[in-house]
Swiss-Prot record:
SUBUNIT field: Monomer.
Any Pfam family hit: Pept_tRNA_hydro
Name of the protein in its database record: Peptidyl-tRNA hydrolase
Catalytic class of the enzyme: hydrolase
Compartments (UniProt record): Cytoplasm
The species this protein was found in: Roseobacter denitrificans (strain ATCC 33942 / OCh 114) (Erythrobacter sp. (strain OCh 114))
Gene: pth
Keyword tRNA-binding: yes
Family annotation (SUPFAM superfamilies): Peptidyl-tRNA hydrolase-like
Catalytic activity, EC: 3.1.1.29
Amino acid sequence: MKLIVGLGNPGPKYAGHRHNIGFMALDRIAADHGFGAWKDKHQGSLSEGRFGSDRAVLLKPLTFMNNSGQSVQAAMRFYKLEPEDVIVLHDEIDLAPGKVKYKTGGGHAGHNGLRSIHAHIGPEYARVRLGVGHPGHKDRVPGYVLHDFAKADQDWLDDVLRGVSDGAPFLATTEAAKFSNAVALRVSPRRSGTGQKGKDKPPAPAKQQATATKAEPEPDTRSALQKLMERFK
């Protein structure tokens, strides 16, 4: 069984924030795959269900982002799970909008939700990094992630959420490559940092080969004496 965790902050005022893309992803998964009603358990909101024969639990910690690890640890203890059974979906400012990356282990890169999970269960869990882009300067990061997605983001955001939902059965079976492929089928290439679909550049036209050839000089049939006489004319 897998515990799939989406990170965010509870409450309507935070629902549309970039920081809450993990919550959004879990809501889409639960709706698309017929998971059970959300129930408040283990300091979070929890929904149980199956992807085929594979059982999974979806968890949205209600502890606020900075204490997400408390809820994750409580759910792990109840279901008797190991860190290797946990997959965390979270916002990632170091990825362009619309980019999705799967990884296992590693640092928290300053993400407070991951920092809390590290402190409670260690780093050996899987993550799905959901790119939201970077505001350009580190001082602007808090205001950026704690702000609603722009209207211009809605198209790529919907593609990402659909793609993650399409790939969710492969999260349950730890098939990272198949998960990534499912996402890629939904998410088309985008211009870095804009969240807009990029247009393929037309191939550069092939250089035309010159068809004209240089004229060959005619052979000089004069004798040496004739050439000498020509010089003194």
